[in-house]
């Protein structure tokens, strides 16, 4: 990943493997994959067929038998490797609580 992309991050990402389903809002197309890292503001998803950059998505994460769905957008892709997702900034307190619990559990 480039230094420029790293500089744009507001929250540190931590290694976290979770099942994920990415749903394209415009088409309903679904992609099942897994995350390799997670933060309060986004995640990286390992997939051979990343969704195009700028696509608006819903991200359904499952970790520790708990499910969380967040709105977001694909911010970059690495063909054959994966894609970076930025979550919408307006997380509900419940969504933020789940993310924080998962992130703290990885330390």
List the model feature ranges, each with a label.
Residues 1-107:
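Structured alpha-helical
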